[in-house]
C-alpha cells in the first residue's frame, strides 16, 4: 500500500522516463559497446530528474491547473470578453515563456547562431537572441490561445484557424531565411510541452463548461494544436523582418 502521496507520482514519473533510459543504456552497452561513464553521477542525476518532474507535475496539479480552469469559468460567467481574452493571452504567454523546452531551444539556437556568425560571438548577443526568440514564441502562443478562446466563445469550427495557420506556414516557408526555418518548425513542436498543454487544456475545458451551448468534449479541446502552429509563423516572421 502506497501511503506517501508522492510515491505513486514518483513511480509514474520513473515509468514515463524508463523507455528513454532503456534506449540510452541499450545503445551505450550493446551498440557503442562502451562502459557507462561516471555511473554514480548518472544515477544521481536520473533520480534528480525523476524527483524534479514529480514535484513539478504535482505542483501544477495542485495549484495552476485548478486555478486556470476556475478563472476561465469565472470570467465566462461574468461575461467580460475583454478580460477573458486578456487572461487567455497572458496565460498562453506566461506558460510559454516559462516552458523549459523553449528555454533549452532558445539557448541552443543562440549558440549555433553565434558559431555561424549570424550574431556576434558574445554572451550578451547570445543572451539577447535567446530572449528575443523566447518572447517571440511566447507571444505566438498567447495569440493562439486568444484566438482559440474567441473560437470557443463564437462557436467557430476548429478547422478555420488551423487551415489559416497551415496556409500561412506554407506561404512563408519559401521566403523565410534558411537559417530560421528549422528553428521555427522545432519551436512549434516544443511550444506545447510540460507547462503549456495542461494549462491550455484546463482553460479550454473550463471555458466550454461555463458557456451555455458549448460541449467540453467538442469545444474545449483544440487549443493546443493551434498553439503549436503559430510559433512557426511568428519565428519565421522574426527571421524575415528582424
Where are these regions (language model features)?
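Hydrophobic core segments of alpha-helical transmembrane domains in multi-pass membrane transport
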Residues: 16-30, 45-55, 87-93, 138-151, ...
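C-terminal transmembrane helix-loop-helix hairpin of multi-pass membrane proteins
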Residues: 2-14, 39, 176-242
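N-terminal alpha-helical transmembrane segments of multi-pass membrane transport
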Residues: 2-84
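Inter-helical loop and helix-membrane interface segments of multi-pass membrane transporters/permeases
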Residues: 1-7, 29-40, 106-131, 178-190, ...
Amino acid at each position: 500500500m502506497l501511503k506517501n502521496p508522492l510515491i505513486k507520482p514518483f513511480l509514474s514519473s520513473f515509468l514515463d522516463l524508463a523507455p528513454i533510459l532503456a534506449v540510452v543504456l541499450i545503445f551505450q552497452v550493446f551498440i557503442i559497446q562502451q562502459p557507462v561513464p561516471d555511473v554514480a553521477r548518472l544515477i544521481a542525476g536520473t533520480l534528480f530528474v525523476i524527483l524534479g518532474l514529480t514535484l513539478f507535475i504535482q505542483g501544477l496539479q495542485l495549484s495552476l491547473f485548478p486555478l486556470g480552469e476556475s478563472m476561465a469559468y469565472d470570467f465566462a460567467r461574468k461575461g467580460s470578453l475583454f478580460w477573458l481574452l486578456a487572461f487567455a493571452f497572458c496565460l498562453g504567454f506566461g506558460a510559454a515563456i516559462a516552458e523549459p523546452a523553449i528555454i533549452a531551444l532558445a539557448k541552443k539556437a543562440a549558440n549555433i547562431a553565434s558559431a555561424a556568425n549570424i550574431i556576434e560571438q558574445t554572451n550578451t548577443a547570445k543572451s539577447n537572441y535567446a530572449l528575443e526568440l523566447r518572447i517571440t514564441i511566447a507571444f505566438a502562443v498567447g495569440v493562439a490561445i486568444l484566438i482559440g478562446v474567441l473560437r470557443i466563445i463564437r462557436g467557430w469550427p476548429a478547422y478555420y484557424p488551423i487551415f489559416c495557420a497551415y496556409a500561412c506556414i506554407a506561404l512563408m516557408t519559401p521566403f523565410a531565411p534558411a537559417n530560421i526555418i528549422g528553428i521555427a518548425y522545432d519551436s512549434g513542436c516544443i511550444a506545447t510541452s510540460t507547462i503549456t498543454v495542461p494549462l491550455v487544456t484546463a482553460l479550454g475545458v473550463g471555458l466550454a463548461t461555463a458557456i451555455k451551448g458549448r460541449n467540453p468534449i467538442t469545444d474545449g479541446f483544440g487549443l493546443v494544436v493551434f498553439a503549436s502552429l503559430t510559433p512557426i509563423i511568428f519565428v519565421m516572421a522574426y527571421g524575415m523582418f528582424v
